[in-house]
Swiss-Prot record:
This is 4-hydroxy-tetrahydrodipicolinate reductase. Belongs to the DapB family. Pathway: Amino-acid biosynthesis; L-lysine biosynthesis via DAP pathway; (S)-tetrahydrodipicolinate from L-aspartate: step 4/4. The active site is at 158 (proton donor/acceptor), 162 (proton donor).
């Protein structure tokens, strides 16, 4: 799209919301059209730019998408599963595209998203980082070459405030590896170990989770054999990498037909 894409950001007052506002401010082809917070928030009425530390943008934080119907083309949501479903329903009814960076959806919620995406364009990805999406391609290659004769473990770490575990990114890593190897992740995943577990089953994919301090996001996939191991690691040092990816997705999405897309498609990696 040649012109600017207008975005709305829900959860504007949160850590990720403020980062998204800052990212939008610095993007040549993106313009912040609306910023939304929950009803009753003390941030309602505050200038979104001042909230994010980039100066006045003349976009005031509102407490409902209904007040911003004509102000944006794409909604960006990094909130919570229940809220994201409500926001997507709103987007369908008002013919708006949506970028979803929320993680932690259950099976029923994913089915709802699939159904809604038949009516409006949606990008949903557990991680919007370019580096992470490239990592998933590297995992396919590693699994293809080494997966059948190595022990596979996925280790991830995030800040103390993250609510879901393992992270959506870690689960996606497992899905990529399992699919490449022809395995069912639901049957081969092992989430943490405790007590006398017995000898490791080569067919399993292990997950370990760390929650500590202000870790932005660290993910490692380990392919371990006797005598050597391969580790593929991505470390995010700032939420800005996720925010910039979301803006890239929004700019790409506005010209797409209804459907459910991911960052691999946005980045042309498929």
């Amino acid at each position: 799209m040649g012109g600017q894409v207008r975005v709305a950001i829900v959860g504007a007052g949160g850590r990720m919301g403020r980062t998204l506002i800052e990212s939008a401010y610095h993007q040549e082809h993106i313009r912040l059209g609306a910023a939304i917070e929950r009803p009753g928030s003390s941030l309602v009425g505050v200038d979104a730019g001042e909230l994010a530390g980039v100066g006045k943008l003349n976009v005031l934080v509102m407490d409902s998408l209904d007040y911003a119907t004509d102000d944006f083309d794409v909604l960006i949501d990094f909130t919570a599963p229940e809220a994201s479903i409500v926001h997507l329903d709103w987007c369908v009814r008002h013919k708006k595209a949506m970028v979803i960076g929320t993680t932690g959806f259950n099976h029923a919620q994913k089915e709802q998203i699939n159904a809604f995406a038949e009516q409006t364009p949606v990008v949903m990805a557990p991680n919007m980082s370019v580096g992470v999406n490239l990592m998933w391609k590297l995992l396919e290659l590693a699994a293809e070459v080494m997966g059948d004769y190595t022990d596979i473990e996925i280790i991830e770490g995030h800040h103390r405030h993250k609510k879901d575990a393992p992270s959506g990114t870690a689960l996606k890593m497992g899905e990529v590896i399992a699919k490449t190897l022809g395995r069912d992740l639901e049957k081969c995943a092992v989430y943490g170990r405790e007590g006398i577990t017995g000898e490791r089953d080569r067919e399993t994919i292990g997950f370990a989770t760390v929650r500590a301090g202000d870790l932005v996001g660290e993910h490692t996939a380990m392919f371990a054999d006797i005598g050597e191991r391969l580790e593929i690691t991505h470390k995010a040092s700032s939420r800005m990498t996720f925010a910039n990816g979301a803006m890239r997705a929004a700019h790409w999405l506005v010209e797409q037909k209804p459907g459910l897309y991911d960052m691999q498609q946005v980045l042309g990696l498929n």
